[in-house]
């Protein structure tokens, strides 16, 4: 899945960052959402609705291991914070307060995702992501 999303740092909207989400499998129904992703000085809250249900809805999805590949598009001053490799994690749907700080994601079987980027509860911009 290829996503374009907004960066948010120190309450200022930054440049767009391309992120590639490569899941080992897709399973489950309904929506999924992430915890805030905090790497270096960046804080990003990413919520995706995979064509069914609403973000934060009652439907729970199974665990989905995946890789969040952080690209080299970030400026060089933050490259060491973001890294050039990947983060592999698993996260279960539900109340985000009960899950770890570093974001994991729940996926469902939809070819198109509506991507909402927000930080500190403030909506920033919608984008589209499609399965690769």
Curated annotation (Swiss-Prot):
Expressed in lymphoid tissues; Detected in spleen as well as in B-cell lines, NK cell lines and activated lymphocytes. It comes from the Eukaryota. The level of circulating virus in the plasma of HIV patients (viral set point) varies among individuals during the nonsymptomatic phase preceding the progression to AIDS. This polymorphism explains 9.6% of the total variation in set point and is associated with the HLA-B*5701 allele, which has the strongest described protective impact on HIV disease progression. However, it is possible that HPC5 polymorphism, and not HLA-B*5701 allele, plays a direct role in the control in viremia in HIV patients. HCP5 is localized within the MHC class I region, but is not structurally related to MHC class I genes. HCP5 is related in sequence to human endogenous retroviruses HERV-L and HERV-16. It has sequence homology with retroviral Pol genes in HERV retroviral element; thus, it is itself a good candidate to interact with HIV-1, possibly through an antisense mechanism against retroviral transcript. This is HLA class I histocompatibility antigen protein P5. It comes from Homo sapiens (Human). The lineage of its organism: Eukaryota, Metazoa, Chordata, Craniata, Vertebrata.
